[in-house]
Amino acid sequence: MKQLPWRADPLVWGHGPRVFEVFLEPTCPFSVRAFGKLDDLLAQAGEDRIMIKIRLQSQPWHMYSGVIVRCILAASTLAGGKEAAKSVMAAVAAHREEFEFERHCRGPNLDATPNDIIARIEGYSGVNVAEAFGIPDLDREIKWHCKYARQNGIHVSPTFMIDGLVQADMGSGDAIADWASRLLKG
């Protein structure tokens, strides 16, 4: 069977000169908080002034992180591209507890399979990711996100970079106005 060509749509919004990279793990509560602020940040700061790039930071203590990250990137290969991926991220964020283990080691998800997780994502997001999840070399995109984070010394989520420099003093609890102010000065 011949494999069809595919392309993962970059998770990038805005087209301004200031680049804000956000390293997120989709089930991390702090990443979820940061993710929830990105649309408002883009609106406040201006699409012509900043560019937001989401980098996926899979973390093994979030037990289904790898499956969920693959679903997000699979969604980015579909007709909706980055917006489909964003819908998957939003669905996971809105139902975070249903994709996580209690204290990272127990609870109902012990009995969940990757197919169960995919079905939940499809049900909540309305994005049919199952077929794209099976793209054999989709792992090259996953590995790119991992390698990019590692080369930049990123170990936790969320982590923020402005114009290629890690901003260790920025956090998900910061006000959107503070993020915007920081991005727009320079």
Regions found by a protein language model. Name each.
Residues 17, 68-69, 126:
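Residue-level signal for cytosolic alpha-helical hairpin/rod architecture
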